[in-house]
């Protein structure tokens, strides 16, 4: 089984948000990207178990997105 985990930076709240269409109920946030990955690694098995998914090894693919702006002086 493979699950895609999407990470999006919320500039207004200054946190990373993790969601997944493959893992119902997964919505986590953290100011630290690394800490959020660890939280996701613990939450995914629990959520899949709650959603009656059979026990097996799950491949996690992490996809991050962050938009930023810079000023170009010319």
Which residues are covered by each model-predicted region?
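Short, charged, surface-exposed hinge/linker loops at domain edges
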Residues: 1-6, 34-74
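Short amphipathic alpha-helical segments
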Residues: 3, 22-24
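A short, exposed loop/beta-hairpin motif centered on an aromatic-Gly-Thr core
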Residues: 24-35
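Short aromatic-glycine-(Arg/Gly/Cys) micro-motifs in beta-strand/loop hairpins
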Residues: 8-21
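Residues within well-formed alpha-helices
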Residues: 17-19, 29, 39-42
């Amino acid at each position: 089984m493979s699950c895609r985990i999407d990470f999006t930076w919320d500039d207004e709240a200054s946190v990373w948000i993790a969601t997944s269409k493959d893992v119902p109920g997964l919505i986590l946030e953290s100011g630290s990207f690394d800490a959020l990955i660890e939280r996701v690694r613990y939450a995914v098995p629990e959520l899949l178990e709650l959603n009656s998914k059979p026990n097996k090894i799950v491949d996690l693919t992490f996809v991050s997105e962050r938009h930023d702006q810079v000023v170009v002086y010319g």
